[in-house]
Curated annotation (Swiss-Prot):
The gene is lys-5. The keyword Secreted does not apply. The keyword Transmembrane helix does not apply. It comes from Caenorhabditis elegans. Disulfide bonds: none annotated. It comes from the Eukaryota. Induction: Induced by Gram-positive bacterium S.aureus infection. Down-regulated by exposure to Gram-positive bacterium B.thuringiensis spore toxins. This is Lysozyme-like protein 5.
């Protein structure tokens, strides 16, 4: 009987370790973040840089508001600008992190959104762009991770590129299931850190979000 209860306690601790989170690109107030926190969501990932080539000031404020609500795991993501008129890869990271610092707040992890949108066909150039972003983040002492999946990675840098496999992976796959069971390894990652399991939906407290899960 004693062993039975120990087994139950261990099972419960594993289940309770799983965490729910959201990523957002619309304005959310501190009070709404408090509602989201109370609804059981423990990590937040606002967008802090637009693919159009500018800092997402709404996202930076979301970082600040989320922390003011008592959330401690607050990240940010960059949707890079790939046009010839855009700032360099390093300067996009610099602008994002400088904006976060200027707002008097911080992010836990900077995620680089690597998905098919305006990326050139040149894998070598794309790899260099990503490497420059990662290097700039590390120069700031900022923890950095990659947002991508098998098909995006294949098209943008090629499946033989494992250059960022030491970083955490945020994996989008809208299968409606909060687990890693359908994950297919790519880019040197044996498993992801986060699963984005639902595309944009009305989430906690009426906010439009993508739903995420950490086991």
């Amino acid at each position: 009987m004693k062993h039975f209860f120990i087994t139950i306690l261990l099972f419960c601790s594993v289940v309770s370790a799983a965490r729910n989170g959201i990523d957002i690109n619309s304005p959310v107030s501190t009070s709404t973040f408090t509602c989201i926190k109370n609804a059981g969501f423990s990590f937040i990932i606002p967008r802090i840089y637009h693919s159009s080539g500018s800092v997402d000031t709404v996202g930076v404020q979301n970082v600040k508001n989320a922390r003011a609500a008592g959330l401690t795991d607050v990240d940010g993501y960059i949707f890079p600008c790939l046009k010839s008129t855009c700032a360099s890869a390093a300067n996009q990271v610099k602008a994002s992190l400088d904006a976060v610092k200027a707002a008097g707040t911080k992010i836990s992890t900077l995620w680089l959104d690597i998905e098919r949108l305006n990326w050139p066909a040149d894998h070598a150039s794309n790899r260099a762009f990503i490497e420059a972003m990662v290097s700039e983040a590390k120069a700031y002492g900022q923890q950095v991770g990659i947002y991508s999946n098998y098909y995006n990675w294949q098209d943008i840098v090629g499946l033989d590129y494992h250059g960022q496999s030491s970083l955490m992976l945020w994996w989008p796959a809208y299968d409606g299931v909060k687990d890693f069971s359908k994950y297919a390894p790519f880019g040197g990652w044996s498993k992801p850190t986060i699963h984005q399991w639902s595309d944009t939906t009305t989430g906690p407290c009426g906010v439009s979000v993508d739903m995420n899960y950490i086991p």
